[in-house]
From Swiss-Prot:
Pathway: Pyrimidine metabolism; dUMP biosynthesis; dUMP from dCTP (dUTP route): step 1/2. Keywords: Hydrolase, Nucleotide metabolism, Nucleotide-binding. It comes from the Archaea. The lineage of its organism: Archaea, Thermoproteota, Thermoprotei, Desulfurococcales, Desulfurococcaceae. The active site is at E127. This is dCTP deaminase. It comes from Ignicoccus hospitalis (strain KIN4/I / DSM 18386 / JCM 14125). InterPro entries: dCTP_deaminase (IPR011962), dUTPase-like_sf (IPR036157), dUTPase_trimeric (IPR033704). The gene is dcd. Catalyzes the deamination of dCTP to dUTP. It is an enzyme of class 3 (hydrolase). Homotrimer. One of its GO terms (biological process) is dUTP biosynthetic process. DCTP binds at K101, S102, S103, F104, A105, R106, D117, Y159, Q168.
Amino acid sequence: MILSDGGIKSYLRRGLMKIEPFDENQVRENGVDLTIGHQYARFKNTEDVLDVTKEEDLSKYYELGFMDDEGIVIKPYEHVLLHTREYIEMPADLVGLVNLKSSFARLGLYIPPTVVDAGFKGEIVIEIIGSSFPVRVRPGVPFIHLVFLRTDSPVLRDYSVRGHYQGQRGIRLPKLPIKL
C-alpha cells in the first residue's frame, strides 16, 4: 500500500520516520519531494578498467565536487551522482521508491530505478543521467519524489544490519570489492 499525505504526516508526527530538515510543503499527495544537496560526483571518461571484485582507487573514475549557489551543469548524456539535502530515517515497515520529479524528466533527465530500503538512515544518493542538452541544477531545488510503500510486516533484517551506505551524508562512492 502506498502511503497518502496523511499517512506520511502520521509517521513523521509519531517519530516513526524522520526527514531533516523538513518542511510540511514537501509532503505531496502520495510522497515527499526532496531537494538537491551540495556535493556531487561526475563520472570520468577513462579507458582504465574497474574490477568490481577488487579494491580500487576510485579517484580515477570520479571527480568529486561541491556546488555553490550557481550549481553545476549536467552535460548531455553525462552521469552524475547527486544527493539529497535531507537526511531520512526509514522504519522497518516502509520501503521508498524514488522518482525524478516530472519537470526534470520533461527536460530529458533520467534516473535509474532506485529503492530506499526499510531501516535505511542517511541522505539518498541518486545517479542522474543528462539530457540531449546541458541542464543546470542547483542545491535546494526539489528534484526527486519519494513514495513510501508499507510492507506486509516489518522486515526481519533491515538495512542497518548489512547496508553499505547506512548513515551516509553527501556522496559516498561505491563500496568495493563487491562480494561474490
